[in-house]
Amino acid sequence: MKANPPLAWHPVPVSAPVNLRWWLMHQESLTRLLQAHCEHFRVEPVFQTLATACIDELEVMNLRRQNQVLVREVYLRCNETPVVFAHSIVKKEHLRGAWRGLSRLGNRSLGTMLFTNPLIQRTPLAFKKLKPHHPLFERACKQLQMRPINLWARRSLFILLRQPILVTEVFLPAIHQL
């Protein structure tokens, strides 16, 4: 049996802890789900710039290594505790098209926009256990007091007018307290 390459994302989070699987597999808006589970919810923007995509994002976004994308990263906080690190990328040229408002979201939820527009289509979720060498693991851990051994993430494409945005959500240890 052939081993999965280290960059692979999987259609099912088979080895994820049972109490995390429910969060990972939830198909609707993660923003709305978190809002229902905490008294105070907020989006904290931490990074937004034009950059190159992570190596495991290139194929799914049909990018070359040198292509510029808008990278937006935020923490989703429940009662001031970061519970999810969200990372989204969109091709630079699509910022003048379907995703033109993305660069001005600020502390507003991208999820709210994605799940209220009936023209946006979502691809199936993919899952990965992120290890410390993965760039998203490193960035997700910046505000954590203790670094975990690994972090589970999920991602999917949202497509508007044939223009995709890739949204990756990294679940932080505090999610278990909700």
From Swiss-Prot:
| Reaction it catalyzes | chorismate = 4-hydroxybenzoate + pyruvate
Q: Where, in this chain's numbering, is substrate bound?
A: R72, L110, E169
GO terms under cellular component: cytosol
| MF GO annotations | chorismate lyase activity
Give the EC number(s) listed in the UniProt record: 4.1.3.40
UniProt pathway: Cofactor biosynthesis; ubiquinone biosynthesis
Q: Which keywords appear in this protein's UniProt record, sorted alphabetically?
A: Cytoplasm, Lyase, Pyruvate, Ubiquinone biosynthesis
Localization in the cell = Cytoplasm
- Could you tell me which InterPro entries the record lists for this protein? Chorismate--pyruvate_lyase (IPR007440), Chorismate_lyase_/UTRA_dom_sf (IPR028978)
Q: Which residues form a coiled coil?
A: none
Q: Does the keyword Lyase apply?
A: yes
Asked whether the keyword DNA damage is assigned, the reply is no
Name one process (GO BP) from the record.
pyruvate biosynthetic process
Task of the protein = Removes the pyruvyl group from chorismate, with concomitant aromatization of the ring, to provide 4-hydroxybenzoate (4HB) for the ubiquinone pathway.
Per the record, the similarity remark reads: Belongs to the UbiC family.
Name of the protein:
Probable chorismate pyruvate-lyase
